[in-house]
UniProtKB/Swiss-Prot annotation:
Protein name (Swiss-Prot/TrEMBL): Aspartate carbamoyltransferase regulatory chain
Record has Zinc as a keyword: yes
InterPro entries attached to this UniProt entry: Asp_carbamoyltransf_reg_N (IPR020545), Asp_carbamoylTrfase_reg (IPR002801), Asp_carbamoyltrfase_reg_C (IPR020542), Asp_carbatrfase_reg_C_sf (IPR036792), Asp_carbatrfase_reg_N_sf (IPR036793)
Alphabetical keyword list: Metal-binding, Pyrimidine biosynthesis, Zinc
MF GO annotations: metal ion binding
Known cofactor(s): Zn(2+)
Stored HAMAP family: Asp_carb_tr_reg
Positions annotated to bind Zn(2+): 107, 112, 135, 138
Family matches, as NCBIfam families: ATCase_reg (TIGR00240)
Pfam families referenced in this protein's UniProt entry, alphabetically: PyrI, PyrI_C
Length: 151
């Protein structure tokens, strides 16, 4: 088995255990297509004992907000976030899908009040596996494909 060689980052975040093929979506929802001069690395289809294949995203000079971690949980509920300081892992945690998703997802119902009024979107998690959420306002249930296209 070939060894994966990736340059270490001094400060930043490593998102590991992303299901294979979803790393680009993580980069997209975090608006990282143009990093602030730091390293942005996507390793795709890397061997994983846990998942078989996985993606890894390394972001130099960026630490994730709670909202960003919640977004990642909707795309990659198996992901692990590593906070790197002075070339070492200072903190490590698994993402968790919150019970309520507030302000980060649009309702797929074009007639929903959240798409026409100045109200913050709000969804309740109905199921984590498979992922399903229900809109607080119109009660529409959305499944993973709709969730991903409305982030």
């Amino acid at each position: 088995m070939a060894e994966l060689k990736v340059t270490a980052i001094k400060e930043g975040t490593v998102i590991d255990h992303i299901p294979a093929g979803k790393g680009l979506k993580v980069i997209e929802i975090l608006h990282l297509s143009r990093p602030n001069g730091g390293v942005l690395l996507l390793a795709s289809n890397v061997h994983s004992k846990k998942l078989g294949k996985k993606d890894i995203v390394k972001i130099e000079g960026k630490f994730l907000s709670e909202e960003e971690v919640n977004k990642i949980s909707l795309i990659a509920p198996t992901a692990t976030v590593n906070i790197v300081r002075d070339y070492g892992v200072a903190e490590k945690f698994n993402v968790e899908i919150p019970d309520e998703i507030v302000g980060i997802l649009r309702c797929a119902n074009p007639n929903c009040v959240s798409n026409h009024e100045y109200v913050t979107s709000k969804f309740y998690v109905v199921s984590r596996e498979p992922l399903k959420v229900r809109c607080h306002y119109c009660e529409r249930t959305m499944e993973e494909s709709e969730i991903l296209s409305n982030l």
